[in-house]
Amino acid sequence: FGIGRRSEAEGRELCKIAYPITYSAEDLDFFSGAGLYDSYSAKKDNDKKTIENAIRKVWASLWNWRAFDERSYFKIDHRSCAMGILVHRSFPDEDANGVLVTRNLYNQNPGFIINVQYKEYSIVFPEPGILHDQIMLFAWSINPEQNFTPEYLSFSNVPALNGERVLSDAELEELGDYCMMIKNYYYNNVPHSCNCPFIDFGLDIEFKVDSEVSPRKIYIKQVRPYL
């Protein structure tokens, strides 16, 4: 509700709110649970897409068949599970979507892996022949005014980009700064099972880039341990 009130004060109204989920049998050392549950959106002045209906549907997805079957396979007591709901504004016409992992998955050089794609093109389930930008964002720079050095591992071939990159160098720098702060906080303040040095501590960070209600900016959508 705070998001809606603020946007009205700015003269622009966010009419849709999304309800992703998290729950107590997720991101365990032996069980991720990612993708098993459902997210729904609510829309202002829509009799069918009400907040109440969205919450009920999210809660009900705790008992969808794929989630039940997966928990059973890993011998998780269904009665021990509880679900929480993350509420955020929806992004009906995002400029970019992406995922960042806060460790180098390829070698020992400090850095992040970024997978980002134009608009709502899927990274996880891409259309045949469609590639996304993958960037190794090294956590150092020979430029004293920058903290990171990007190295592209693949390039998006979405025709609408006309060969341009999904994120600008300035946005990559900004995203790196945000995620380094998040990594520092989680490593030092949030209990975790990673008995590892800071360089090897991995978080999976989902982000959006959007310009619907303000000038183009980065939104951190979700943070979870990288398993």
Feature map (PLM): residue ranges:
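Conserved catalytic alpha/beta cores of large enzymes that bind or transform nucleotide phosphates
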Residues: 116-212
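Extended active-site and interfacial segments that coordinate phosphate-rich ligands
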Residues: 34-65, 92-159, 219-227
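Short acidic, glycine-rich loop/turn motifs
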Residues: 21-25, 91, 209-211
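Compositionally biased, intrinsically disordered low-complexity regions
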Residues: 4-6, 12-13, 100, 113, ...
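N-terminal beta-alpha lobe that positions the nucleotide/phosphoryl donor
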Residues: 1-86, 95, 183-198, 202-204
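Short, low-complexity Ser/Thr-rich regulatory SLiMs
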Residues: 89, 102-105, 207-211
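Core catalytic machinery and nucleic-acid-binding channels of phosphodiester-processing enzymes
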Residues: 86, 90-91, 97-102, 178-182
